[in-house]
Amino acid sequence: NGMVFYEGEYHLFYQHYPDANVWGPMHWGHAVSRDMVHWEHLPIALYPDSLGYIFSGSAVVDENNTSGLKEGNNAPMVAIFTYHDQMAANSGSQTFQSQGLAYSLDRGRSWQKYHANPVLANPGKLDFRDPKISWHAASSSC
């Protein structure tokens, strides 16, 4: 899903179903490393909820606070991800994927989903997934 470097740690996020070694309701697993050789698994970052399973996405450190989520001195880590509504998919809906946002204010140790998810509704596309976010310095925008 994504890798980001923040305050001396590499953060790796990955799709994960913690209950079995088969496909199921996806979560975002989370691991950190200081050297990219030795990894520590942290608690699951993102869990499925009423909007759906947690599919692919990306994460950034919002140094410029473009999200407006900063509190105190720590830049927020912000993740954008695909919600996959399996019940809607099973019913034949073409708009079963939307985009959600989550953030961490404690170096990725805990995550809060944005209160107004989904942040991007499906515009009528069958495959509306895998959002990527990056900072464009020339225009000072995401």
Question: Which positions does each model-derived feature cover?
Answer:
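Beta-rich carbohydrate-recognition and catalytic domains
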Residues: 1-131, 135-142
